[in-house]
Amino acid sequence: MATERLNQVRTSVFQASQSLLQTLSTSLGPRGLDKMVVKDKKTVVTNDGATILKYLNHHPIHGILSSMSATQDEECGDGTTSVVILAGCLLESISSLLERNVHPSVICDNLEIAKKIGLRYIDRVKMECSEKDLISNVTTALCSKIASSTGEMAVEAIRGMEYVNGDKKNIRVVKKIGGNLDDVKAYKSILLECDLKDIPKKAKVGVIQFCLSAPKTNMDSKILINDPALMEKIIQDERKYILEMCKKIKKSGCTLLVVQKSILRESLSDLASHFLKQLNILVVNSVDRKDVDYICSAMNIQPVSEVDLLSPASLVDVETGEVEGMLEIKGYGCTILLRGCDDMVVEEAERSLNDALCVVKCLKELPFLVPGGGSIEMGIALMLSESTEGNIYVLREIAKAFEGVPYFLARNAGLYPVEIVSELRSELKQNCCAGISVRSGHAGDMVRDDSVVQPAKVSISVVTLALETVSMILKIDDILPARR
């Protein structure tokens, strides 16, 4: 009975992983196709593995593979589809081993050996990365994305990372509808939406987290007015209350006010806006909490929660200007402005930009690159098939799984996959930089001829995550429903 249940669970796991492999395999590589995902009346068009998996949770195994892809996305930005395809191919090979009564413990031990062999191979073929190689790396990461036709995003991503000394968290992305993807640009400044009339060249910036509007009663409270004269008095009191707040802001010396968005009431009333305009104070209204945190971090100031706490000490002197119809605070942080014809294009462009930024970050942390075009996976497959370290039979099955990545890469490019994989296998024995060239339709030198390279950290992460995740899945013997 227990054996029957175990077989049912394993069959379910392998079938779920194979369905996911079939879905994602067509999105691999520069000629990979996009997926249209529809959920809750929201439509997303993307070929990013992590984004697709975010919407697919039909089986518990999908959640595990989704977490693996999300980790790859967070660590490296690139390789989110490759890691899932490699894991799927490994599970397919392992299922045939289990059918031949190979014990899971033996397979897990050999997966660990395969990981060591794979990392050793990457260490052997990696090359030092120079500043000139940055463009090639970022372009390779973007070749399957919506921004593949333009080199502007790669250039601006590198420029943006230079502005913040390689710290991706200090880059803010602003999306605007209109224009095209070529209009992407990195600014060494903070860009904010506001009324652009009479922008001063210099300003004193203050950030507030309180509302400039009349105070509200509690949700269940009511105000009953019996005398019409009291209505006028309430209006005058509200006017006086807001005017006093505006005068205190003016007294502090603030000339540019950033107001955080409120979910309870309007952050800036029409009356407050009128008074501040009369006092020559420029207002940036309804700024999101995360943007307020970014502004404060970039400018090294503290947001003020009460009007009485606003003082000259809480302000910062800045130079301002106008860029693309937005207020520019010069010299602080970094903003990358993305443009596109509609929301769907801009969202996908943002995901592409994130990949580009992560690739630059990877190369700053580990300045080594490896050839692309399935070269690493095929090279590891050759090493495993020739290795005598573990169980030769198991290692050869794992080697077949690694050949899956160049196979799907060739198939998606419209080539004959079996023929190309065989050609790549023979080429790699003579040249460790050989890979599948989508341009020529044959195996060629990825570094010299095609300039298709990727950070070594991406390949290290793909191999490590895929093998460790498969090893964990292999140890599952039952799926238990949890209490809701």
Swiss-Prot record:
Keyword Nucleus: no
Location in the cell: Cytoplasm
Gene Ontology cellular component annotations, sorted alphabetically: cytoplasm
Nucleotide-binding in keyword set: yes
Main location: cytoplasm
Subunit structure: Component of the T-complex protein 1 (TCP1) complex.
Role: Molecular chaperone; assists the folding of proteins upon ATP hydrolysis.
UniProt xrefs under PANTHER family: CHAPERONIN
Name of the featured protein: T-complex protein 1 subunit delta
Organism ancestry: Eukaryota, Fungi, Fungi incertae sedis, Microsporidia, Unikaryonidae
